[in-house]
Amino acid sequence: MAQGVLPYKYEGERNDAGMTALAGLPIYLDLASVLGVADCIGAHVHVRKSDQGWTDEQAILSLMLLNLAGGDCVDDIKILEKDEGFCRVLGRVETKRQTRQQRRAMERWWRKEHHRCVPSPSALFRYLKAFHDPEEERTREPGRAFIPAPNEHLQGLRKANRDFVGCIQKRHPEQEATLDNDATLVETQKKEALFSYEGYKAYQPFNIW
């Protein structure tokens, strides 16, 4: 590589070292474990009706981690999947809360060839579709802001978020809370999206912090 003031050198790592470029995410995994995020989700969100496939906790936590990692779309979940070090950490977290028998079964599952550490983009798209109510779309009026009524799964997610806030309040009680709200433009390439006042296609979710 071209040299400047400092003599930089680099070389490719030839062996499988298990390093990660997402070193900040394990801190959030630890926080989620301490606050019982998985328990909050499991108590209220019931999209998954069988024991097969990814659980509600795994799907939602993967989406949370994708957001924290700066993903722009569901397809960016591939970034997490390709990071071997992160996948090893996530696998460790998955087995921590289980019994020995469950842990051994999970470890055998993780050792299977081509096993994913996070749901595939198609699996996440199918999961997210459960939170969408097509009947509500019929009441949408062109050119007007519209907030669809939440279906049972969105209501469950709201309850899980309520419990999560309660866990934080329990550990750090506050008498007052300031809610900062703002409508933010999120650029999208979806063909059904409308153009924003900035001149590009976007959705405008109403965020509250």
Predicted regions and their residues:
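Dynamic "connector" segments at or just before major functional cores
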Residues: 1-209
